[in-house]
Amino acid sequence: MSIYSQTFLYLYRLLLFLPQKTGMRENISIIGRGIGQVMFQNNALSGIIMLIGIICNSWQLAILAVAGTVVGTIAASLLNYDKEDIRAGLYGFNGTLVGIAIGVFMEINIISVALLVIGAAISSWVAHCFRRQSLLPGFTAPFILVVWLLLITCHYLYPAILLPSLSENPDNASHFFQSFSLNIGQVMFQGNILSG
């Protein structure tokens, strides 16, 4: 069984434990809203459409995105954060981005999946810290801080897990539609025109 199949099975099992007293449909809506919140959309359908865009680029990144969303949401639920914020997907979207970043920057193996779980959970805690103060909005700062921490840690402790950097393709800048679509897709690390 591949790491992606195992991840999918774990996600399904974890999905059953999302905020208590809710059904499977509500749990799926929470996940959809969590993904949708990456683009400030408190709407499950928007999140599902964004997930389809990710799938157009990479089904593996889509699984990691859902995994990050589920872990971030479960962490918030276990830490008894505000239920309405959880239902709105406010603790899932940073996990979504952490999951995608793991797939973009790291080789997928048991260590990177463990880092995804740890990173998505910590991103919920950091998001909660931002929500408790009113001086500075958090937005994606929890994701950025957590991924920086993960990348720096891996760079010094386990550099073999990090993927090599890819060079840019200078031809894309000459085509407006391609560039526009690629830029929108890059919000979720998707390098595919259909994803944008």
Model-derived features: where do they sit?
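Membrane-interface helix-loop-helix junctions at boundaries between adjacent transmembrane segments
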Residues: 90, 95-166
